[in-house]
Swiss-Prot record:
Active site per the UniProt annotation: D52
Role noted for this protein: Formation of pseudouridine at positions 38, 39 and 40 in the anticodon stem and loop of transfer RNAs.
Keyword tRNA processing: yes
Gene Ontology MF term list: RNA binding; tRNA pseudouridine(38-40) synthase activity
Residues that hold substrate according to the record: Y110
Cited Pfam families: PseudoU_synth_1
Major enzyme class: isomerase
Subunit structure: Homodimer.
Protein name: tRNA pseudouridine synthase A
Alphabetized UniProt keyword annotations: Isomerase, tRNA processing
Reaction catalyzed: uridine(38/39/40) in tRNA = pseudouridine(38/39/40) in tRNA
Family: Belongs to the tRNA pseudouridine synthase TruA family.
Listed EC numbers: 5.4.99.12
UniProt source species: Francisella tularensis subsp. holarctica (strain FTNF002-00 / FTA)
Length: 258
């Protein structure tokens, strides 16, 4: 039995998220269906981070076990031929049998993309959140300082979150402006359900001048979801990287745009 790692890219618009669901089409279902056909046996996969409905990935990491002998090219080109255009395998490699894409991960990186322009873009409309008002990046980054370290993020978790603990460790949270794009990059050991989109929604209020940077600290300490802003839309969020003890994978979405 061999353990294989896949690096996956997908556009999440047409899916209910990563995780297999009985009522809707998921990325996991499409990938397992294609892998199972190539392997001629049932294949189940594990992913580094389960993305929600409409969320994308440039570097999702998946692993699966199979005793079917196939060259690595078959696991990539053969499976890609069976996958829809909005899901593709970028790379494949054999890994140690102890490797688990979810539980071996040290941290995960997400990008949230904002298109900050007076006029919306027909090309990027489904890839970014459009904000026509000017955003104060400096104040947003000041607010990000309050997010760093291990903290209780109850104020930024959804009511449907099933995690046993609201504590998460954020190593990086930063906004970077590149032309008309503003990229929020956040790195953490793990994230709560809707956590990043809830953070973005609140940080936008700071950037628009409705709240001060210190307001984020007040919201955090409240441990109350109703004190934070509304959830930012899903289509601006991308899973872009994972770090493991032996290696890391990262493909920043803005580098694909520019």
């Amino acid at each position: 039995m061999k353990n294989y790692l896949l690096q996956i890219e997908y556009f999440g618009k047409n899916y209910c998220g990563w995780q297999r669901q009985s009522h809707s089409l998921s990325v996991q279902e499409e990938l397992e269906k294609a892998l199972s056909k190539i392997a001629n046996q049932n294949i189940e996969v594990t992913c580094a981070g389960r993305t929600d409905t409409g969320v994308h990935a440039t570097s999702q990491i998946v692993n699966f076990y199979s005793n079917a002998y196939r060259p690595l090219s078959a696991w990539q080109r053969g499976v890609n031929a069976l996958l829809p255009q909005d899901i593709k395998i970028l790379a494949v490699q054999q890994v140690n049998n102890n490797f688990n894409s979810r539980f071996t991960a040290i941290n995960r990186t997400y990008n949230y993309i904002i298109y900050n322009s007076a006029t919306s873009s027909p090309i990027f409309a489904e890839h970014c959140l459009w904000e026509n008002r000017e955003l104060d990046i400096d104040k947003m980054n000041q607010a990000c300082e309050y997010l760093l370290g291990e903290q209780d993020f109850s104020s930024f978790r959804s009511s449907q979150c099933q995690s046993n603990t609201p504590f998460r460790n954020i190593q990086k949270a930063e906004f970077i402006k590149q032309g008309s794009f503003i990229v929020f990059e956040v790195v953490g050991n793990a994230f709560l359900h809707h956590m990043i989109r809830n953070l973005v929604g609140s940080l936008l209020k700071v950037g628009l001048g409705f709240e001060s940077p210190e307001w984020i600290k007040v919201v955090l300490e409240a441990k109350d979801r109703t004190q934070a802003a509304e959830t930012a839309k899903a289509h601006g969020l991308y899973f872009v990287g994972v770090e493991y003890p032996e290696f890391s994978f990262k493909r920043q979405i803005i580098k694909l745009f520019c």
